[in-house]
């Protein structure tokens, strides 16, 4: 979606290009001028299987298969899978407190849409693809659905989606909100548009105190003149009920490890280059003994790419399980991470060894399996901080220290057991955040 990112933020172009500072008027003009090109771009994405060809009109605010449910409709925007989990956790708590509410969840990705279909079948939830931020497309969307309130999850902030919602005088909330330091700097280069966008919500639920400060600065608030509440509630991605798993799959992996007398090393939520790095590191270790290295990529469609790098291995998506003398196994499915966490002797949490920003550490910490991560953890900085201090997570900064840390972590000690117990308690407490956030949200909506 590089073209859309440039429209959203022209300062994301390569260094050396003339910097372009957006005003609201110029932003709208860019969308209107580039609208036909963006339409063409979306149809190209259909060929790449990155868009649903049967629902492509939803990206233009039209062609919805579902009708607006009667009664109160709360709109939650969750761009992709991670935000989608936070949205579902929030919906579950809001539904407990307000049984007559209905929920519309918009997403940007097919994977997130499939996750909603799988997990919300018996909930008052409707899914739609996010309209792109062309002023007319957003207007069509709001006119069709007529939401009674809007909640934007995490860090996907689109100017027209936010400001047009604000113009309709709807309660507008940013929840589980965070923004990277580099993104903050880019927004600061466009102060007119940033201030109007970030001062629009009446409530911001930030993930930590640093994020609270970022949002207050972008909104142009100083101490004593804030027109909105910015409250720290933490990330909303995890809940205790997510500790359920595919028991048969989990037990099959444990039985394999028992029969093979090997340790299970799980490379979880990995991104490009990380599988190769972890495989090479583990293969050089002489003190680990027999092991099974399971790859559970963040995006399972990368399975062919991983096999081309590391060679043939059994695949979960084909109904296969590890066989004697297998060193690698590819768990290329969605919705089975908890079973993998439970079966593993150690978790190497991906998205943290290059520049992806890391993934939610709360979910694996719930299972009590020790975790290793890399240096790139800015997306969940506060949660990593407390879990690193507890000792259930260990952080490495090179392949050399990764290998050493794997060996040390597999040698369970009483100190590590205490760290795991402490980390599990922290993770369980974090899973209660959606309850706290729901109270703030209901109070704002019903004000």
For each feature predicted by the language model, list its residue ranges:
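Nucleotide-activated sugar donor-binding and catalytic core shared by glycosyltransferases
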Residues: 2-7, 13-447
